[in-house]
Amino acid sequence: GVVDRALGSVRLRVRLQGPGGHAWGDRRLPHPVFALAEGLCRVRALVEGREDASVNASGLEGGQAVNALPQEAACLLEVRALEEAALAALLQGVEAAFAEAARAHRVGLALEVLGRRPAGRTATPRLLQAAERALAEVGERPQWLPGSTDASAAIERGIPALGFGVYRGGGAHTPGEWVLPSSLLEGQRALLALLRGLGVG
């Protein structure tokens, strides 16, 4: 496949804080976990049905004891979009969604940006043609895909770049992730063909 377009992303840590307390005696006090849950549901609604953007939540935590109100609930959040403008708008929507949830539940809110990757495309026609020819040499056709790869660092600086590779595998980021080792040799041949096509080596 060929990643010819950088998928923009912003990674955040979301923290909601309350006073804590006893699960029964302080049951009317603000509850950060329910605030976090509501915020996440609001955020999920922002990308429902969209093909150009996504949101993912992971690393949820909050509380230590089942009979105590947690003082804090937190999660890691990543938003992605194909265009910078869409990414900026989605990020604003995420901030507003959590602000509304925090206000409704009377808890504190802290959003920390952990990292950013820009959306964009810098691959030149020559680079794209070289990738297509290199894949043809190993009997493959290019699958042009957006993605978040190491090429994003070059794209951010305006340097012509793309992500390129050939392998057989599946189940990405799951316990069942797999790759066929012999397919990596095909990928190696394609990479060497790409470098030759660009006059490198």
Tell me what each language-model feature is.
Residues D4, R11-R15, G21-G201:
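Metal-dependent amide/peptide-bond hydrolase catalytic core
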